[in-house]
Amino acid sequence: MPRKGPVAKRDVLPDPIYNSKLVTRLINRVMVDGKRGIAANIIYNSFDIIKESTGNDPLEVFEQAMKNVMPVLEVKARRVGGSNYQVPVEVRPERRTTLGLRWVVNYARLRGEHTMEERLAKEIMDAANNTGASVKKREDTHKMADANRAFAHYRW
């Protein structure tokens, strides 16, 4: 905890092609070892693949995918009287976006396609259609929260 009060949240600049802050955050999530140019090329090439495959605007497909992946509830461990409970809590909007991006990129990396552009494009298209590993992760998170609804009164 810093002594001078809370740290100001840094604002990300919208990307130059799609003029979207969400795309910039996706580029930052894909970036490895500070190589932003390579990450941006991966994103833009995968958006081109999405445009060719679906014929729709890739930004709209990506935003729909994010809506389908972002969790509403999650569980947090809470220690009460010597035992740990998984307490369901609502997810803040900023964290929802962060988790959604993290899951899409992580599960795209685990896919079997040849290049990262193809993997990311397929994962985004699957998420937009409510299928794929990242949507399953969201469903599993919601199931965990639903299963532990009995401990909701331990919320803080």
Curated annotation (Swiss-Prot):
Functional note: One of the primary rRNA binding proteins, it binds directly to 16S rRNA where it nucleates assembly of the head domain of the 30S subunit. Is located at the subunit interface close to the decoding center, probably blocks exit of the E-site tRNA.
Biological-process GO terms, alphabetical: translation
Subunit structure: Part of the 30S ribosomal subunit. Contacts proteins S9 and S11.
CDD domains linked to this entry: uS7_Bacteria (cd14869)
GO cellular-component term (any): small ribosomal subunit
Tree of life domain: Bacteria
InterPro entries: Ribosomal_uS7 (IPR000235), Ribosomal_uS7_bac/org-type (IPR005717), Ribosomal_uS7_CS (IPR020606), Ribosomal_uS7_dom (IPR023798), Ribosomal_uS7_dom_sf (IPR036823)
Alphabetized GO MF terms: rRNA binding; structural constituent of ribosome; tRNA binding
The encoding gene: rpsG
Transport among keywords: no
Similarity remark: Belongs to the universal ribosomal protein uS7 family.
Protein name, entry field: Small ribosomal subunit protein uS7
Organism annotation: Enterococcus faecalis (strain ATCC 700802 / V583)
Keyword annotations of the record: Ribonucleoprotein, Ribosomal protein, RNA-binding, rRNA-binding, tRNA-binding
Endpoints of the signal sequence: none
Pfam families: Ribosomal_S7
